[in-house]
């Protein structure tokens, strides 16, 4: 069973987005696959797993949230890490992504992940294809 959704939360108000997420979780099963194409990743970041990031016809990343958080660290802080693959200025500091060499736990930020992948295409592909 496959369900393909293109920008499913586009134009929805906040209560409708919440209802959509609940429906996706309710009707997801082991024998079904839901493919969601979206630019509104914050609307769906708690229901997406695995994450596949494409660049035209090239798969840059195809990994579970567990694998991503094992290999990459997502940090919110006031100082930039020297091995940062991606960083973005936020009010009060930075969000940054760097290799998780200390095996620390962090919550995957899908927007930062997307930007880190596109900024470091070959490096990220290498990190995740050499499992």
Which positions does each model-derived feature cover?
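Catalytic Walker B motif of ABC-type/P-loop ATPase nucleotide-binding domains
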Residues: 3-7
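Helix N-cap at the start of a conserved alpha-helix in ABC-type nucleotide-binding domains
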Residues: 14-16
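ABC transporter nucleotide-binding domain
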Residues: 19-35, 39-96
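C-terminal coupling/interaction segments
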Residues: 86-131
